[in-house]
Amino acid sequence: MSDIDQLNASLLAEIAAANDEAALEAVRVSALGKKGSVSELLKTLGAMTPEERQTRGAAINVLKNAVTEALAARKATLRQEAINARLKAETVDVSLPVRSSPAERGRIHPISQIVDEITAIFADMGFSIAEGPDIETDYYNFTALNFPEGHPAREMHDTFFFHPDENGERKVLRTHTSPVQVRTMETQKPPIRIIIPGKTYRQDSDATHSPMFHQVEGLVIDKKANVANIRWVLEEFCKTFFEVDSVTMRFRPSFFPFTEPSFEVDIQCDRSGPIVKFGEGTDWMEILGCGMVHPNVLRYGGLDPDEYQGFAWGMGLDRIAMLKYGMPDLRDFFNADVRWMTHYGFRPLDMPTLFGGLSA
């Protein structure tokens, strides 16, 4: 056995015997360091004849490569063994109670809670969730929703526009979640029953408005959808959401470009106290907008309005959260105030269900 073969066997044995990364690093330095055994052999290449370099030089390079590969493989093995040992030692007892210190107790944001509540309600009615991009094209945000040229919503004072792209097109931060209606109609055959929760953006900011706010809307498309269906769906939703036995609602004629006929919906309530009470009283409060999907919107979605019809509704999540839980200022939703979250937030394990209670 040549000296190179002996050195190779010795180094590979030392590498295999290394029990941790520190020991392995010591072997690497002794072999490949500036004065390592393999490095010293490489220094002799310059003094060799061409014939020796072809044979002995090649053998030295093979040795170097073998040692390098063995070091890398052993290092990977040691790291995996360390991870396995750590995982074995670190156990989590899932039966332990949640930490009770107020400083350590997390809270679910009211908006997340409201989304979960609404999802639970409409899932029980057979609806699914649909989503879409926050950055929209003019086509999906306006044109496909029957907004005419020159509509105020297309102006800079109301909508956040991006700079024009290379084609001159200006994208927008969506002003409503309605573009998802058209996107869904393009990709899904009727019957369609969806709700669309998400962020929306408009240039408005005060105690009840924010430049970024949350909406949810619903869409039903089939061959027999009608206004009576809208009323039933919304009444069932409001009863369940506000956790009352009955609600009285009134539908006022209104105008939205994407529905015809269009309605604004008021719910009867009692506003005499600091908290609005639903299901009682003689006051009225506007809560959402709705209507039958405009035939032009159906056409943009690739559906024949002579065969299909539908209804849609939309409401502000932030606003109904304020109404239900008595929050006075919308801006507090986004201030990241731990005290506010401690007061208005929800415990993580209290998931809203129709059987256990939405806001338990």
UniProtKB/Swiss-Prot annotation:
Q: Read off the InterPro entries from this record.
A: aa-tRNA-synth_II, aa-tRNA-synth_II/BPL/LPL, Phe-tRNA-synth_IIc_asu, Phe-tRNA_ligase_II_N, Phe_tRNA_ligase_alpha1_bac, Phenylalanyl-tRNA_Synthase, tRNA-bd_arm
Q: Which Pfam families match?
A: Phe_tRNA-synt_N (PF02912), tRNA-synt_2d (PF01409)
Q: Which GO terms describe its cellular component?
A: cytoplasm
Task: Keywords in alphabetical order, please.
Answer: Aminoacyl-tRNA synthetase, ATP-binding, Cytoplasm, Ligase, Magnesium, Metal-binding, Nucleotide-binding, Protein biosynthesis
Q: Which reaction does it catalyse?
A: tRNA(Phe) + L-phenylalanine + ATP = L-phenylalanyl-tRNA(Phe) + AMP + diphosphate + H(+)
Residue positions binding Mg(2+): 260
Protein biosynthesis among the record's keywords?
yes
Provide the assembly information: Tetramer of two alpha and two beta subunits.
Family membership, please give it.
Belongs to the class-II aminoacyl-tRNA synthetase family. Phe-tRNA synthetase alpha subunit type 1 subfamily.
This chain's protein is named Phenylalanine--tRNA ligase alpha subunit
Q: What taxonomic lineage is listed for the species of origin?
A: Bacteria, Pseudomonadati, Pseudomonadota, Alphaproteobacteria, Hyphomicrobiales
What is the primary gene name for this protein? pheS
